[in-house]
Amino acid sequence: VPAGVDDAAKVKAEFLAKVAKGEESCALISKGKAAELLGTMLGGYNVKPLIDVLGDAEVGAIAAEGLKKTLLVFDFFHDVAELAKCGNANAKAVMQSWADGEWFTSRPEVPASQKLTVFKVTGETNTDDLSPAPDAWSRPDIPLHALAMLKNPRPGIEADEAGSRGPIKQLEKLAAKGNLIAYVGDVVGTGSSRKSATNSVLWFTGEDIPFVPNKRFGGVCLGSKIAPIFFNTMEDAGALPIEIDCGQMDMGDEIELKVDAATAKVTALKNGTVIAESQLKTAVIMDEVR
């Protein structure tokens, strides 16, 4: 069940709130587990139930841990502040954590070096290649819609079923090498702005988001040229888009990508030999990915 503020999230939050408060019991989920799961819902319907149990001796500390990593609290901030003023130790801990930015500092830094397997798409890829208009009906279902990515024949891309299903088997073979896959292209993401295009790329190149189904984040996208709108959309999704010469990167290559956070210098190596160098568009992108 998704986090956030859709109808399903409301039902999820209301049920977990009742269990966390002890108003309902569930053989599969304890009070503590219910509070922990509420704390994974990112904001919205989960915020008030978490605040309501901050004074609970059994689950208050668990609720505090969830709130520490929740940013989308809006006016409920004042409720936590008021509880802290009244001496609630868990509320005080949440306020201090927010002040210290632990929601950010607790996350792992972007690795200075990472091994990637190249999924190379030669020539120009536009957003309709990545998220075909005839498949627009499936865009809300990211894993389903991703099956249509690159479904039309093009050099080097082995569609499972030309015109209907993209190179899923080819991508699975690359994933079997054990590294994250990098989407690599000559010109990437031209055409109209489509978040669905980014979603499809990240489905195959990103990592699961804890407690959020059917969506991924992170991933690396390398392009000799990346269209500005696509670059920004990748950035917003927590991916690492880098403009770098991809001429010596071929389908299936295992490369090492080094990023120096201090200088924003990017180095790509194949078999230990430097094959391309570049600069991040902004050093801040390392913090954005984190």
List where the protein language model places each region.
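Structural detector for internal amphipathic alpha-helices that build alpha-solenoid repeat scaffolds
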Residues: 1-6, 28-43, 52, 61-72, ...
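Amphipathic alpha-helical scaffolding segments comprising HEAT/armadillo-like alpha-solenoid repeats
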Residues: 2-22, 41-54, 73-84
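Short inter-helical turns and helix N-cap capping residues of alpha-solenoid HEAT/ARM repeat scaffolds
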Residues: 26-27, 55-59, 87-88
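N-terminal, positively charged, Ser/Thr/Ala/Gly-biased leader segments
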Residues: 82-147, 290
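Short, surface-exposed loop motifs enriched in S/T, G, D/E and P with embedded aromatic residues
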Residues: 118, 275-280
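Feature captures the catalytic cores and cofactor-binding loops of soluble hydro-lyases/lyases
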Residues: 137-275, 283
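Internal alpha/beta core interface subdomains
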Residues: 279-290
